[in-house]
Amino acid sequence: MKKLEVFGANKLNGHINISGSKNASLPILAATLLSNKKVCLKNLPNVKDIHTMINLLQSLGSKTNFYNKKLIINNFKQKKNFASYSLVKTMRAGILVLGPLLAKFRNAKVSLPGGCAIGTRPIDIHLKALSKLGVKYKIVQGYVHATAPKGLIGSKISFPKISVGATENLIIAASQAKGTTVLSNCAIEPEIKDLVNFLISMGCSIKWIGKRKLKIDGVEETKETTYSVMFDRIEAGTYLIAAAITEGNLKINNLIPSIIKTEINILKKIGAKIRIKKNEVHIIGNKKIKSMNIKTAPYPGFPTDLQAQMMVLLCKGNNKSLIKEDIFENRFMHVAELNRMGAQI
């Protein structure tokens, strides 16, 4: 697509079903590498990163069949442990294959990741945590060369700061480590919990023993499973904000409202009328938008992935608003473009 032309001043009315979560699907796809059994994943979104991750799994030897949001994976002959730059460079989640490859083969060579330019997003937290499971690593010419000569060995690990990616990598790796691993200061995003639920469905032994604390008993074998990925809360939040911006009347289906209660509560305070049912949120936008201050934060705080959308909405506010970005240091690139359109930021 070279150009997308938007005709504004139209209200968003109607109803829409929310897609499966990309951010939940990617670590789950990486985790399938642990299994030598058939895995069936449902409700996968049809987006570029999903296809890239599937291509990465295929390059490692996985056999896949993706049709109508459903992916069947067979790893009977999966014996490769090299994740190339050509695939990992476009997607941050590519580094998530490091943990399962180490668990399966005791060594791996994985390219440093690429992805969107919204900050440094270093992987040092991943590597330092993996080293506590017995991993030795070095970075040579853009690749992580990692080995676990004695296999992965369970340990007590406390993340120095909350990291979604590091939490995911360690959960996957520890699921087949020898003994027990206790992870503290974990990210608790719904996508993390979806990953845990998927691994449990494969026969892994994982238990939450505190708000941000996990106990993982390593298993030698996994079992065949069928699993449906959770809804995309960022997509849901984007449609809710878009309805508020356009003063629309929108019903959003195929979601769990309690997971996005922070976003719902903020939209209510701003002036939107919202009704909630079991798997549905009905929003009616308001002409009068109340200004407010917002700070991004790890879940259950306001998500950084909705910060730009919320900024557009607050441009319509009745007073000054303040947005503080506490997750990434370079995520205000949209400000200049909004100012070109007449915003005062």
Residue ranges and their predicted role:
Residues 1-345:
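Short, structured segments at the rim of ligand-binding sites
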